Amino acid sequence: MKCICSIYKSPRRREMYLYVAKKDALSRVPEGLLAAFGTPQHAFDLVLMPERRLAREDIHKVLENLEKQGYHLQMPPPEEEYVEHLPDELLRMNDPV
């Protein structure tokens, strides 16, 4: 299955994206989801195919959701992925001897 997809970003949550079939636009997205998502901001369009790889989503799940429910919601990564981890030697620099 090949799908031309429009991807929208949420103004409310960083790294939250809504995938929809371009031909349907936002018509199949439930009103409650749109209210929680905020006014969708178009990020880009993309041709999705089963052999294509996505950075943080399973392409097969995205295509399945687009076909069955008309949209796919990509949630932000867990908070701990936002934190930069410092090496132990830097964390111990101010420890008393």
From Swiss-Prot:
One Pfam family here: YcgL
Ranges where the YcgL domain occurs: 3-87
Xref: PROSITE patterns: YCGL
InterPro entries: YcgL-like_sf (IPR038068), YcgL_dom (IPR027354)
Name by which UniProt lists this protein: YcgL domain-containing protein Avin_32960
Organism: Azotobacter vinelandii (strain DJ / ATCC BAA-1303)
